[in-house]
Amino acid sequence: MLNDLISDGLTRIRNASMRRLDTTKLLHSNVVESVLKILAEKGYIESYNLIEEDNKKFINVVLKYNEHGKSAINEITKISKPGRRIYQTKDEIKRFKNGYGTVIVSTSKGVMSGIEASKAGVGGEVLCTVW
């Protein structure tokens, strides 16, 4: 059984991006869906939609590339892991890659980007970084 759906999803996106695939399919969870919502808002992926096959839910992710075929995602890294959780307060959440990257944080108010968490005045578990 798979324990960390976020890591699995990020790895599937990273692998599909390196192979220049148009889409990839992830296992569904609410947290993964929240992370994908942020990735879509920030322009790292084209879109995503929910699908159901054999009474199992999946998320189909449409990846985004520029006109030269380069992926919008340069690097996507899981920070907090099941064996070592990483938490940051609102003051510790910093800009990533001088504002070119995005930190995704799970807070008491839901999953949001690091900038949104700082503005909301909440800290939380740092899920991943993307640039």
UniProtKB/Swiss-Prot annotation:
GO molecular function per UniProt = rRNA binding; structural constituent of ribosome
Offer one example of a GO biological process linked to this entry.
Answer: translation
Keyword Ribosomal protein annotated = yes
Superkingdom, natural source: Bacteria
Q: Which GO terms describe its cellular component?
A: ribonucleoprotein complex; ribosome
The family database entries (InterPro entries) matched by this protein are listed as: Ribosomal_uS8, Ribosomal_uS8_sf
Keywords recorded for this protein, A-Z: Ribonucleoprotein, Ribosomal protein, RNA-binding, rRNA-binding
Family in the record: Belongs to the universal ribosomal protein uS8 family.
Q: What does this protein do?
A: One of the primary rRNA binding proteins, it binds directly to 16S rRNA central domain where it helps coordinate assembly of the platform of the 30S subunit.
Assembly with partners or alone = Part of the 30S ribosomal subunit. Contacts proteins S5 and S12.
For this protein, the record's HAMAP family field holds: Ribosomal_uS8_B (MF_01302_B)
Tell me the protein's name: Small ribosomal subunit protein uS8
